[in-house]
C-alpha cells in the first residue's frame, strides 16, 4: 500500500522529499550553475529578441558552444565534455527553465545529431562535425 495519498488516491510517484541533485555529480552541479549564470546574464535577453523577431536563437547556441556545451556528450578524447544522459537532461531543463525554451529545443536537436554521429563515427564525420565543437562551432 502507498504511504502517501493524492487526494483520495494512493500516491506512487516521487515524494516531496526526493531531491534531483542526488543523481548529479559535483561536476554536473557546477555545469548547472554555469548554465544558470549564462541564462540570467545573456540567454534570457536573447530569447526575447529571438521570439519577438521570429529568429533562430543563434547567439544562445554560440554561447553554449563557447562554454563547451555543444560537445556535452562527446567523449573527451574527441574534445567534448564526456558527460552522460543525466547531464544532458539537466542541461536541457536548465536552459528551458532559466533561459530560452526555443534554445533548449534546438539544443536537443543538436545533441540528437551529435549522438547519431557518435553512434557510428567515421574519421570524416568526426573531422567535419565533432572536432569543431570544441571551438564552439555549430
Could you tell me what each predicted segment is?
Residues 1-27:
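Intrinsic disorder at enzyme termini
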Residues 25, 29, 131-134:
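Short alpha-helical segments used as structural interaction elements across diverse proteins
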Residues 27-41:
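A non-catalytic, amphipathic alpha-helix used as a structural packing/dimerization or gating element
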